[in-house]
Amino acid sequence: MNLALNGQLQTIASGTGQLCFYVKGQGRPLVLVHTINAAASAAEVRPLFESLSQHRTVYAIDLPGYGLSERVDRLYTPRLMTDALHDLVQHIQAVHGTQTIDALAVSLSCEFLARAAAEQPTHFQTISLVSPTGFTGLKLRQAEEGKTYGLNWLWKLLKGPGWGLSIFNQLTRPKVIRYFLKKTWGSPNIDEEMYRYAVWTTRQLGAEHAPLSFLSAQLFSADITNIYDKLQQKVWMSHGTRGDFVDYRGKQRYAHSENWRFTVYESGALPYFETPDQFSAELLQFISPT
């Protein structure tokens, strides 16, 4: 078994299937949630897992369909991913008691974390959103609750004999994975350890199922502005200035909200890989009880 992180691998049986996550450290719990793409896993939060576990008990989840969690053939939706976070929080509270939890998510998974925090506000003390989706341009995403941008016709096409797996295999060739990571970093200086794990994880049985839902937009929420509006917790949003993910004009909506704060790094979309000490220090300051 190839582990993404240097921590204790734990597994729980949940309503969303078999969930795997890594645990390390002591103290108040902190949850880390990786991105969503064709090759995602908990390996994408490695610098934070290593540094923050010196101060907290850190839980880094493999979301359903990714990493070592269950990869069954099904439709993967925001509801499924959000419920997986609820299941993890329920487990954490059984271990640590019913104290509030700090949580950080990256990219599209910020939408799942925000939804979980909006649905169970008393479970979360702080929410950290790294390069979150739903802020491109000034368009408001205020569809009816639970609606997604999913293209059902495309998902059905991708699930057809041979099509989806063939496309997935093309998108996860080592050269293609490196290409997309360079676009994420906005630089050729990607993290090689993360790259190697991305190549490995896409070769595992069932690795295509969740990414095919991602490719057909099933995991993008059309109501996410309404969800972000509901957040009562302290929210820290951060992003970089390089690569494909630099348009966050939508954050203007929360510029004067007392519970929101913002940091822009001279980095790609994963600033904690490039400025790990600075990012970790600022995260620790943010999540420290006042």
Segments the model singles out, each with a brief description of its role:
Residues 230-267:
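Conserved loop-alpha-helix segment in the C-terminal half of the alpha/beta-hydrolase fold
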Residues 20-68:
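Conserved HGGG/HGGXW glycine-rich cap/lid loop of the alpha/beta-hydrolase fold
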Residues 1-18:
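N-terminal cap/lid segment of alpha/beta-hydrolase-fold proteins
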Residues 166-229:
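Conserved alpha/beta-hydrolase catalytic His-Asp/Glu region
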Residues 267-280:
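Catalytic histidine-centered segment of alpha/beta-hydrolase-like enzymes
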Residues 105, 109-113:
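Gly/Ala-rich beta-loop-alpha elbow adjacent to hydrolase catalytic centers
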Residues 118, 126-163:
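Flexible "cap/lid" loop of the alpha/beta hydrolase fold
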Residues 46, 60-106, 281:
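Active-site loop/oxyanion-hole signature of alpha/beta-hydrolase fold enzymes
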